[in-house]
Amino acid sequence: MIRKAVIPVAGFGTRLLPITKAQPKEMLPVVNKPIVQYVVEDLVEAGVKDILFVTGKGKQAIENHFDVNYELECKLEKSGKYELLKIIKEIDRLGNIFYVRQKEQKGLGDAILYGEEFVGEEYFIAMVGDTIYSKNIVKDLIKAHEKYGCSVIALERVPKEDVYKYGVIDGEEIEKGVYKIKNMVEKPKVEEAPSNLIITGAYLLSPKIFEKIRETPPGRGGEIQITDAMNLLLKEEDIIGVEINCKRYDIGDALGWLKANVEIGAERFPEFREFLKEFVKNL
């Protein structure tokens, strides 16, 4: 049973400046909820209820969001706004939330390493805090882990010309949409990429990954890449990749954020979908 998750959220969100100058990108709204709430909801729905945020300077809004706000709850109750009160209380009850601060930003691998004491000797989920999926892929990772008994990562097939933006895998398909991974390359040149299957930022990892992160030398920009650590892990353990069968919203830049709001808004709010239809007609 997978009980724990680590969510690194210490990054500055520079590609979304100036909106992220004082606001964590993970707290930007997608329709009526902040990005990171979607991530936490998927984890809790999949049974992963102990969640560690690896934070940094200026991320207090995340802690405030998942904390109890007694003053607000009292005000809503006195005003008779019981539906809003119910929504707020549901956020308070989303799992068991813990925090640790990453003192220096040295890459995703280093951020995940901050979860070692929290995780202990268990397999765990690691997810980036700025990506939303149109279905619960945490359940898919857990299902694959239960079948194969090893680390599992989420994969997505992208156009070949886009592989330079991502970590890319070389692997053998062992059943439809499932790959036994041989190697991983971080942001390869298009002509050198081993495939067009990219790592999406959702991982189910063996606790042995912490040892491998410590063994991983810093790469470009002094960052410790989780892909390099997983390549070291591959020498001792299998890693399986599962191709996601859903939409992924990478909200790392303004266009991605806008797309997520439009598509998720149109899906969840019929009146907004009708507005969009009329709006597009008049463009």
UniProtKB/Swiss-Prot annotation:
Transferase as UniProt keyword: yes
InterPro entries the record matches: GalU_uridylyltTrfase_bac/arc, NTP_transferase_dom, Nucleotide-diphossugar_trans
Domain of life: Archaea
GO MF terms held by the record: UTP:glucose-1-phosphate uridylyltransferase activity
Disulphides: none
Record-listed E.C. numbers: 2.7.7.9
SUPFAM superfamilies, sorted: Nucleotide-diphospho-sugar transferases
Pfam families given in the database record: NTP_transferase
CDD domains on file: UGPase_prokaryotic
Keywords: Nucleotidyltransferase, Transferase
Catalytic activity: alpha-D-glucose 1-phosphate + UTP + H(+) = UDP-alpha-D-glucose + diphosphate
Gene Ontology BP, a term: UDP-alpha-D-glucose metabolic process
Family: Belongs to the UDPGP type 2 family.
Entries under NCBIfam families matching the protein: galU
Name of this protein: Putative UTP--glucose-1-phosphate uridylyltransferase
Organism, as annotated: Methanocaldococcus jannaschii (strain ATCC 43067 / DSM 2661 / JAL-1 / JCM 10045 / NBRC 100440)
